[in-house]
Structure formats: C-alpha cells, structure tokens
C-alpha cells in the first residue's frame, strides 16, 4: 500500500487525515480508509497512524460495513451483491469513525456513480527525460500510455473520471532449489511518476481521445511480458473538484492515501466540531478496467532481470527466488495473461 508523503507543497497544520474509498466492482466490494494524526515538526509533518478506531462505511439504507485495521489501512472486502451491504446504483455512502479517544468523524454522503467504460487504451514507445545524481538530464527509452473515453453518459449527463495504474510483469528466476526448480513469477506494482489524473467534461468536449496517463521507463520489467492495468473510476463532481485541486498543488504522484500538498478542503469533518483541521476525502466509485499489453519486442527487447549485474548479490534476491521481488509476487498465472 502507498505511504503518505507529507513533504509535498506547504506543510499541513496539526490535524487528522481521513482518506479512502469504496469500490463497487463486478466481483467484490472493496473499502479502504487511511486514518492518521498529523503533528507539526519544524517545517514538516509527522504522521502517526490511528490503529484502534471503529471504522464503518454506511449506505443510504443504514446498512454498515465494518473495516478492520490491517497493514496500515482499515479494510473490508465482501462479494458483490451481498444483501447485508447493498451497493445499488444511485445509493449514497459515507464513512463514520469513532476513535479510542471518543473522537467522531463523518464524511458527506456520496452517491455511487454509474460505471463509465473506456473506449480504448494504447502503449507507444517513446523517451523519458530523467535527471541523474549529478543533476544532468538525459533521455531514456520509455512506454507512454494513453486512454480514450467518453466524458458523458448515454443520457448526456456529465461524467468525471479518475485513473489508477498498476503495472504487471513476468519474471523468471534462476533458483537452484531442487524442490521448486526455476520459477516464473507474476508481479504487480503501482505505476509511479505522474500526477493525479482527473478529467471532467467541458462545454464542447464530450469525448477524451488519446489522453496521456504518463510514461514508464523501460527496464527488465518489460523483458518477459508486461501489462499496464488502468482502473477508470467515474467519481462525483465534488470528488473531482477535490482531486483537481490536489493535482494542481502536488509536484509528484499522489495516491488516494496521500494528504494534499496544502489545506485542500475535503468531505470529512469532526462530528462535534472539536477538531478543526480534518484533511482527506472519502469517495465511492464503480470501476472499470482495461489492460494494455506490451511485448518484449515492442519494448526493444530489454535485458532480463537475471542474473543480477553485481559480483556480490545478496544471498536471497529476485534471481534466487522471484517471490521475494515484491509483496505481490505470485506463481499463479493471471487468467488474462497471454504472453
């Protein structure tokens, strides 16, 4: 899970960060909420996680989904269509929090938007300008990802869109384990390096064509097959306004779990008004997904991850066991993997 970077933009005052989302997908309903307390220290913030709160997502029928604290985030996952917590179209949802110190926080209810399917997405070879340790700039090979999508629903209603990209790649290790032998791992990692991407319709634009979502440097991750999964979220106008402000302030990529680079007003407040500074946003979305493959040939046949280019590699590394390459490494081949 992403960490909070509070060094971006202006330091925030002491307060609380409550950020998260509810995703009503085709297979599962997922909820995640970050809850942290901020302390000013000189010219920066020091976040402290709040780990023993009661966190619930509530729908407009009064049904509640309780979130449990795991690995830094309050989380819950239930099967889609679970009658104990309905996620029907046009229902509204908000988060309610009660800390161990009896501090209560609540978000403004958000109506669940309809799914908005992208028209298509592409991957194109290009270059990316990077800065080395000496401060000199040079161009390196990269893949640029672009998406096309409507910005209005079929009935003409405006749609506001947010994207999250996740990179998937294949890697073969050089294991000498006589039990497992050489393994092929499938690994995913959050796409790094671009700002928050949110788009809404203008008076004369109802379709977005070849909109750039960012560039990814070509490395060994493209040597055996690579997919970029694009999660498109149709969000409310209010959520769009919030993330649009965050995007204009942030100098690097922010995830939904990162505080804005300044005091951007979100939709969460202290229930009794005792805490003035509450930062973050809780939004709801019904996501759609599109995966963009890149073959090794399309990426220029980059060098594979193994063997490591060092004389003294650590005793256990991605080449002795590809499962240690990431917390998300798996030997299970995704059903959609075609390489």
Residue ranges and their predicted role:
Residues 1-339:
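A sequence/structural signal for flexible, mid-protein segments enriched
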């Amino acid at each position: 899970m992403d960490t909070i970077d509070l060094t971006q933009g202006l330091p925030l005052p002491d307060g609380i960060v409550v950020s998260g989302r509810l995703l009503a997908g085709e297979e599962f309903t997922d909820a995640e909420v970050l809850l942290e307390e901020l302390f000013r220290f000189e010219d920066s913030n020091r976040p402290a996680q709040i780990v023993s709160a009661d966190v619930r997502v509530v729908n407009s029928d009064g049904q509640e989904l309780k979130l449990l604290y795991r690995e830094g985030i309050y989380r819950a996952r239930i099967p889609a269509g679970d009658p104990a917590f309905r996620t029907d179209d046009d229902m509204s949802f908000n988060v309610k929090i009660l800390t161990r110190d009896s501090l209560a926080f609540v978000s403004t209810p958000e109506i669940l938007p309809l799914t908005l399917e992208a028209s298509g997405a592409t991957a194109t070879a290009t270059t990316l300008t990077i800065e080395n340790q000496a401060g000199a700039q040079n161009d390196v090979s990269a893949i640029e990802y672009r998406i096309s999508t409507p910005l209005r629903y079929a009935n003409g209603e405006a749609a506001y869109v947010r994207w999250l990209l996740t990179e998937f790649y294949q890697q073969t290790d050089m294991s000498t384990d006589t039990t497992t032998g050489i393994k092929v791992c499938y690994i995913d990692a959050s796409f790094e390096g671009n700002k928050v991407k949110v788009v809404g319709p203008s008076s004369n634009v109802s379709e977005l064509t070849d909109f750039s979502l960012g560039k990814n440097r070509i490395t060994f991750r493209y040597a055996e097959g690579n997919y970029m999964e694009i999660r498109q979220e149709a969000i409310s106008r209010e959520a769009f306004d919030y993330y649009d402000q965050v995007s204009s302030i942030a100098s690097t990529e922010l995830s939904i779990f990162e505080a804005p680079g300044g005091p951007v007003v979100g939709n969460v407040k202290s229930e009794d008004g005792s805490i003035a500074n509450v930062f973050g946003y809780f939004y709801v979305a019904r996501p759609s997904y599109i995966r963009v493959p890149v073959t090794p040939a399309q990426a220029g046949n980059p060098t594979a991850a193994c063997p490591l280019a060092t004389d003294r590699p650590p005793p256990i590394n991605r080449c002795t066991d590809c499962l240690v390459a990431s917390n998300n490494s798996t030997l299970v081949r995704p059903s959609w993997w075609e390489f």
